[in-house]
Amino acid sequence: MVGEEETKKRVVTESLGWLTESSIMPKKHRAIEGVGPSSIMELKAQLYKSQEEAKQTKDFTGSDAQYHRAKERIAAKDSFAAKNSGVESRNLKDKLEHKAVKDGAVSYAALEKKAQLYDKLARGELSDEEGEEKYCVDFFRKGIQHEDPKPSSTYNSSISAPPEDFKQDGEDDGSLFSTKFAGLGHAIGTADVGQHVRMVREVHEEVNQAREKATELKQRRQEQATNRREKLKQAYLRKQLEKLKAQQQQQEDEQKT
């Protein structure tokens, strides 16, 4: 009887979960490489720990669980950490621009660009097309369309009357100059639009003359450069011709000797 009990115990310990009612005989225990009794105990301990945690989460229900979740949600939210995209890059760009303006780099670059433009105008290297691209304002048209001159301009009381060319039929001197006496020897008047247009035309003509002079100077320099290149080319061809003649003469002398 004692031997049968020991045999039953041994079969139960070696079955490792197989059904005892099965007709299949239990296999012998196989040793797994790298797995020992200590590692099996660690796995069982980890399994027991996970089961206990699952039980605690199931038991932890009601208002306490809701309070715990709400508390974690509030702690995780940080309103100051959220930023729009591109804020840091814009701040850095603004700081660099402010520093450049404060140091005077922007003003220096503008003055340097203006000086280069003036040098080109003085040398006549600025073409008409480039000038039109640089200056996008038509000053002549702007002066003609200007119909609201500034009302306050002080003149001397001994101002002369406007010429007869600017008068129309039925107009007198007072229609072209609106004069108001402000005191002894002083008067406040407004110049007519025709005089303003005439001044703008004079400035426009001066600008055109200066532009024509610059164009002529540029053409003259281009012609001089072309003539210089042509002279150099002729001199180079002459030298090459002299070299060829010298080589032919040398070959003829060698053949004779």
Swiss-Prot record:
Keyword Phosphoprotein: yes
Positions of modified residues (Phosphoserine): S127
InterPro entries, per the entry: CCDC174-like
Protein name according to UniProt: Uncharacterized protein At4g18257
Chain coiled-coil ranges: 196-257
Organism this protein belongs to: Arabidopsis thaliana
UniProt-annotated stretches for the region Disordered: 146-174, 210-231
Entry annotated with the keyword Coiled coil: yes
GO annotation, cellular component aspect: nucleus
Biased composition (Polar residues): 151-160
